[in-house]
Structures are given as C-alpha cells and as structure tokens.
A protein has these predicted regions:
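Low-complexity, Ser/Thr/Pro/Gly-enriched N-terminal "stalk/linker" regions
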Residues: 1-38, 45-51, 56-57, 63
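Solvent-exposed loop and edge beta-strand segments that line ligand/cofactor-binding
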Residues: 4, 29-43, 71-83, 110-120, ...
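Helix-terminus loop motifs that line ligand-binding clefts
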Residues: 9, 24, 61-84
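Alpha-helical scaffold segments in carbohydrate-active enzymes
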Residues: 17-18, 68, 72, 91, ...
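Amphipathic alpha-helical elements of HEAT/ARM-like alpha-solenoid repeat scaffolds that form extended
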Residues: 40-50, 80-92, 119-130, 163-177, ...
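Short coil/turn connectors between adjacent alpha-helices in alpha-solenoid helical repeat scaffolds
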Residues: 51-58, 93-101, 131-139, 177-184, ...
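Low-complexity, intrinsically disordered tandem-repeat tracts enriched in small residues
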Residues: 58, 69, 73, 89, ...
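Alpha-helical repeat scaffolds
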Residues: 62-66, 100-112, 141-146, 185-196, ...
Length: 258
C-alpha cells in the first residue's frame, strides 16, 4: 500500500473538517457512530482493520476512528486494554498513514511501564517503542517474552487461550525467536485447531482472529488445512453482530486479508 505524503494527509485532514461523513451505502464498511461509546478493544480492532484502507471512504472512516481513539486515550488513559489502543494509534503514525500528536509516544511509554497484565499483550507495544525511540531495553524485554511464548505455544499442557496468544506472538514475531521452526509451529497450530473442533470450544472473537493471523503467516511454509481456516472464519462471522463491533472488525479483516 502506498504511503501518503505529509501534504496529501494534510489535504485529507482539512477536507474531513468540511465534508460530512460518508453515506452509509456500503454494507461491508463499519461506519463511525458518534452516539456510541466505543471501548478501547473496539477502537483497536477498527484501527487495525482500517489501517489497511482500500479507498478514500475507508481513509475518512479511519480518521474518524482515530479522533475517537485520541479522545478516549486523553480522557481515560488507564482504562483496561488501553495499551493496545495506544499502540495501534502510534503505529499508524509511524507508518505515515496519519498524523499523530507528539504526546502519544509518551502515552505509549507510560502505558507499557504501568501495564502489569498479561506480558504477551505487551510485545507489540515494546517492539514499537524500540522502533520509534530506539529503546533497546524494550526490545530485549520483548524478545524474552516472545521466546517464552514460543516455548509455551509448543506445550500441549498450556491453557488453550494462552496457547493461542503465545502461538500468535511467536509466529508474527518469529524474527525474534532464537530457534524458530516453522514446521513445529505449524504442528502446534494444527493441534490447537483440532482440539477446538473436537471439543467444541467456544472461543472469543480475538482468539479466533489470532489463530487466523498465525495461520496466514504459516500457510506458505507448512501445511495448514484450508478447511480448518474456513471453519474459523465462519465461527468468527457468527460472532459479528451490531452489538459486537470488535467481532465485526475482526471478521471483516479476516474476510479481506486472511
């Protein structure tokens, strides 16, 4: 995807101030609702989707969701799951897709410092800190977590949801794994998917999405059954209702790119 110049982004931002939101005529787009109170999880999923905008309408939608995200981050920086949202916004800025205020990088640093939740969820944030600030300590911490994830992902005794997250991190960040073996990672993916269908596990949309992203990375290098991937996409689509915006975003992304 071609990166817009600063001038082009500036023109689009000025147009966004004077033009109304796009008409809601395309069923495959998730248009912003100014009356809705979006959660950090929902906005992060929407930014992940529209960061790959395909047309001008989707770019306008992206800008609207970024505005919502910035307001939420500024007003409620300590909400659960805020670290991921801040990371999505900061990464869009790093890629030159949007302009972001300078305080976002400080917000990212603060969020990573105070986040005491699941270390797996910090990996992308830590790697982004390394990219934008050349923070070698963040890179080392991320590498340690990624290698721990790789080991946990290959252990059948690891709790299923945690194993899915660990496999996703290990595969999508495999350059940081000391001895990454794509065949063994593929075996872990197939074992997980077989267990899900054999035992009728009810996975949350984000776990299904993580499995699909991992499969997309692995498929060109090791056997990943296409029927298993399609079953997961179908499950994800079933969760996508107007009341579950994050699931809708995940499902749309999977249909387009996975």
């Amino acid at each position: 995807m071609q990166t817009l110049s600063e001038f082009e982004i500036s023109v689009l931002e000025n147009l966004a101030l004077i033009l109304p939101l796009p008409e809601r005529v395309d069923d495959d787009k998730i248009f912003p609702d100014p009356t809705r109170k979006y959660s950090p999880e929902e906005l992060a999923a929407l930014l992940h989707l529209y960061g790959k905008y395909r047309d001008m309408t989707e770019l306008e939608i992206l800008h609207e969701y970024v505005d919502y995200a910035l307001d939420l981050i500024k007003d409620s920086p300590r909400l659960p799951a805020m670290t991921r949202l801040i990371t999505e916004v900061a990464d869009l800025g790093r890629k030159g897709i949007i302009h972001i205020p300078a305080w976002i990088h400080k917000a990212l640093q603060d969020a990573v410092t105070r986040d005491t939740g699941n270390p797996t969820e910090l990996v992308e944030s830590l790697l982004l800190l390394y990219l934008v600030n050349n923070d070698k300590a963040a890179q080392r911490k991320a590498k340690h977590i990624i290698n721990s994830c790789y080991r946990a992902a290959r252990e059948s005794e690891t709790e299923l949801n945690g194993r899915i997250d660990c496999l996703h991190i290990a595969v999508t960040c495999c350059d940081y794994v000391s001895r990454f073996n794509v065949r063994k990672a593929g075996e872990a993916w197939n074992e997980i998917s077989h267990r899900i269908f054999a035992e009728s596990y009810n996975l949350s949309p984000d776990k299904i999405f993580n499995l699909l992203e991992a499969a997309n990375e692995l498929a060109g290098y090791t056997p990943i059954p296409s029927d298993a991937r399609q079953k997961l996409k179908n499950r994800l689509k079933e969760t996508a209702t107007p009341h579950s915006i994050a699931a809708c975003a995940y499902s749309r992304y999977a249909a387009l790119y996975l």
